[in-house]
């Protein structure tokens, strides 16, 4: 679902900022620093109201680089206290998305390091708080699709930052590396739609860094690749898959997914774009437009 999302930024010091976030923002040991970070988030909500937004994403880089540098429990307590004040400022129709990340910029510990801490904090804050899944923010080889299923089951899936990665938070174009993983994630989303899962209403966003390509072209390409994964997931025969699962037929269950994944849906996507008034070949169309500007 399309949502006008506001992202706060307390992981960088801004010009004319009174206090530095070098040692944390919402979890800083200094109350003055925490209050500054809280105020920034509340201001983001106010700007969001002007822009017609309905959600605030909170990602912090707070953490530590050396053992003993930070008291794990006290840091999380400060995070919850700060977030609760932000939560109280949310309009009735807004949601608060808590974004986790395994490491970077902190390399020994990160306060909100994984989906477990994120969802525990979301449960503590209240029903308007949910966990955001950025595909590059997990530990290597983590089963992201199962995390998605768990968050859906407990009505705590906020949405996604779609991207791709090889080593960490690489923010590469969607579908450029792990296309099967992306398909499996979308398969869980389609399954939730199929089951009419309670509280299922995720936000879909792209969060990427384009250093060697035209950013517009990369965003176009990424959008197409996410659509491709979604369409392939729609082709999965849910009844057959459930039957194989009930019979403990692991091979055929896997093959049922691969049958959909290996299907070329490019013609369907092109037809969809044409019927929607879009370009059959988006990249070629965009490049042709550049010739006349």
Show which residues each predicted segment covers.
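Aromatic-lined carbohydrate-recognition surfaces of secreted/lumenal glycan-active proteins
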Residues: 94-103
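Internal, well-ordered alpha/beta segment that forms a basic, Gly-enriched binding/recognition surface
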Residues: 37, 43-51
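Conserved small/polar residues in nucleotide/adenosyl-binding loops
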Residues: 1-5, 292-293
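Glycine-rich, aromatic-flanked loop segments that form ligand/cofactor-binding clefts
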Residues: 3-18
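Histidine-acidic metal/acid-base catalytic patches
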Residues: 46, 53-54, 68, 80-95, ...
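A short, flexible beta-alpha/helix-coil linker loop
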Residues: 23, 62-66, 102-104, 165-169, ...
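Surface-exposed, active-site-proximal loop segments in enzymatic domains
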Residues: 14-35, 60-73
């Amino acid at each position: 679902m399309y949502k006008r999302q506001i992202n706060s930024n307390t992981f960088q010091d801004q010009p004319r900022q009174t206090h530095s976030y070098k040692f944390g923002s919402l979890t800083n040991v200094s109350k003055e620093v925490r209050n500054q970070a809280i105020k920034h988030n509340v201001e983001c909500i106010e700007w969001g109201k002007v822009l017609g937004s309905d959600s605030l994403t909170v990602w912090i880089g707070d953490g530590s680089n050396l053992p003993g540098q930070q008291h794990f429990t006290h840091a999380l307590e400060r995070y919850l206290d700060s977030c609760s004040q932000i939560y109280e400022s949310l309009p009735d129709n807004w949601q608060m998305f808590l974004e986790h990340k395994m490491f970077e910029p902190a390399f020994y510990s990160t306060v909100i390091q994984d989906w477990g801490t994120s969802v525990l904090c979301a449960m503590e804050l209240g029903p308007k708080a949910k966990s955001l899944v950025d595909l590059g923010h997990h530990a290597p080889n983590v089963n992201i699709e199962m995390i998605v299923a768990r968050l859906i089951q407990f009505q705590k899936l906020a949405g996604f930052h779609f991207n791709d990665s090889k080593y960490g938070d690489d923010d590469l174009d969607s579908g450029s590396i792990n296309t099967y993983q992306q398909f499996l994630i979308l398969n869980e989303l389609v399954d939730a739609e199929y089951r009419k899962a309670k509280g299922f209403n995720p936000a879909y966003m792209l969060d990427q860094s384009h250093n060697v390509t035209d950013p517009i072209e990369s965003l176009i390409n990424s959008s197409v690749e996410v659509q491709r994964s979604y369409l392939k997931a729609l082709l999965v025969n849910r009844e057959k898959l459930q039957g194989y699962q009930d019979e403990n037929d692991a091979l055929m269950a896997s093959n049922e997914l691969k049958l959909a994944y290996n299907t070329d849906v490019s013609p369907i996507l092109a037809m969809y774009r044409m019927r929607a008034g879009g370009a059959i070949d988006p990249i070629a169309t965009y490049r042709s437009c550049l010739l006349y500007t």
